[in-house]
Amino acid sequence: MTQGQKVSVGIVGASGYGGVQLVRLLKEHPLVELAYLGGDSSAGKPYSDLYPHLGHSINLNVEAIDLEIIASRCQVVFLGLPNGLACDLAPPLLAKGCKVLDLSADYRFTSLDTYSKWYGKERQDQAIASTAVYGLPELYREDIKNASLIGCPGCYPTASLMAISPLLKQGLIVPETTIIDAKSGTSGGGRQAKINMLLAEADSSIGAYNVAGKHRHTPEIEQICGDLAGHEVRVQFTPHLMPMVRGILSTVYATLRDPNLVRDDLITIYNAFYRASPFVKILPGGVYPQTKWACGTNLCYLGIEVDPRTDRVIVMSAIDNLVKGQSGQAVQCLNLMMGWEESLALPQMCFYP
């Protein structure tokens, strides 16, 4: 695709926080025409009824999900649906010639048995699923360029894998010692009403949830860690809910194989590993990332430290869960699939303060 042709794009499941972020990014993309917004409960409503602040710029209604209409209008379709629905829509859309980017978990796993175990839905589409590419450009850039089906990563896996990938790929740590302590803002829980997301419940409080390997992002993280390490890897992953709207801070701990490695060595290694990755910012020694720095951007900030007392490396990763952790990363994949500049239309300046 040349750098001047507009591509018609549709979003199925545009009513949530990830959906409205995707609408914003695609509306501002110079090579994209937003041609379709689809949904179920919101079908028939102007999009501005859901998000009044967009009434001046988005003149589209949310339409019922109709595969024939979608395929007739759209060259590319983003699926922003709850887990378990995309796997019913993606195969017919692919058969009709659409490229598909799925923001749910349906196409993140190489093993459908793993998916079924964690997400509770039996699948028979292994042939289609096997063609999906995991949409983390910093690891699978070349595969994404040639893909028709992308399984976009989860927000926690994105932040965590960006932190640990260089260590695993180069065999610098003992993989089984990996501990991931991650904290997310409330927008990661979606737009539907939930008691624990109420201001009175979430404000001035921090708490862990889905502890001891119960979070669904655990097998996703372990799958990619295993791919990088060349063998099965188990990690200890504990997520926390923070009293903020946007952002994820993931802190990864692991034991170094070589206790003589120092912080500056690792900073050099990380800079080399991510040298072709425009959205990864390796911080200088002694500087550690904050979620506010990434707010509204597709950036991932990485801070690195070594504790010589314990021979552990500590890597901190900060992203915006709705941008690099979801919609922005999906647009990053779109840019690669279309042969465009990877960073096209993706923000790199944060909302601050």
UniProtKB/Swiss-Prot annotation:
Entry annotation: catalytic residues: C155
Instruction: Provide the alphabetized UniProt keywords.
Output: Amino-acid biosynthesis, Arginine biosynthesis, Cytoplasm, NADP, Oxidoreductase
| Signal sequence annotation | none
Subcellular localization, per the record?
Answer: Cytoplasm
Q: Which Gene3D superfamilies match?
A: Dihydrodipicolinate Reductase, domain 2, NAD(P)-binding Rossmann-like Domain
State its role.
Catalyzes the NADPH-dependent reduction of N-acetyl-5-glutamyl phosphate to yield N-acetyl-L-glutamate 5-semialdehyde.
Q: What is this protein called?
A: N-acetyl-gamma-glutamyl-phosphate reductase
Q: Which species is this UniProt entry from?
A: Microcystis aeruginosa (strain NIES-843 / IAM M-2473)
The top of its lineage is:
Bacteria, Bacillati, Cyanobacteriota, Cyanophyceae, Oscillatoriophycideae
The protein's gene is named: argC
